[in-house]
From Swiss-Prot:
Keyword RNA-binding: no
Any one GO molecular-function label of the UniProt entry: tRNA (guanine(37)-N1)-methyltransferase activity
Entry EC number(s): 2.1.1.228
Main location: cytoplasm
Pfam families reported for this sequence: tRNA_m1G_MT
Compartmental location: Cytoplasm
Oligomeric and partner information: Homodimer.
Protein's recorded name: tRNA (guanine-N(1)-)-methyltransferase
Functional note: Specifically methylates guanosine-37 in various tRNAs.
Amino acid sequence: MRIDVITIFPDYLNPLREALLGKAIQRERIAVGVHDLRNWTHDVHRAVDDSPYGGGPGMVMKPDVWGEALDEICGDGTGQVPRLVVPTPAGRPFTQRTAVRWSQEPWLVFACGRYEGIDQRVITDAARRMPVEEVSIGDYVLVGGEVAALTMIEAVVRLLPGVLGNPASAEQDSFSDGLLEGPCYTRPEVWRDQPVPEVLRSGNHAAIARWRRDQSLERTWRRRPELIEALPEGTLDARDREVLDRVRESDHSGDSRSPGSG
């Protein structure tokens, strides 16, 4: 996979050379290019922004600079084209499903905006010759798209063949089956009077798998109940529904005993 990132702060992307991502580059699982947007400016100040039409606070990133950058990096649309990703709090939510889908792409380009954002005409123009997605990593605002790009790149790259030491790690992650991952434990067997759950020390693989599934269901219901509601029909078996009923009943009983009730 090829990944290009366009930014006015190239050093912000240095973490791409570290840890898991750095190893993926060394092993040639991915090729990464980081590009300084200011290289496509033509004035002495290397300006990439201007005041917004219609007034209002902040500045808007200029279309001519972004247009030239995307033309050079992405091409004119006659050959292979990338999927252009624009991190923005106004975008569609980035999810694990998005990461899985993008992991099948040969080429991703991330356009990291700053200030009030990129002139919308840049996105409209790019969409004429390549697939474009405006994506948000959460309901909050950052100072730029670089952190969001790093987050999404790591989520995608770890899914590529040969990147993780154990491929099963990705298969058992939170969201891989629509649920949150349950708790995990390692040595020592007892730490500060807290023992590892007995089932995990039993060697009974079927029982361990069932315990992990139950814990995943319980954690998801209590922390992200909307994920349970969003599961496709037929995802939950009779045991799953039994576990969820028990958790709901337990939570309801706890609420009824809370101070001030009755």
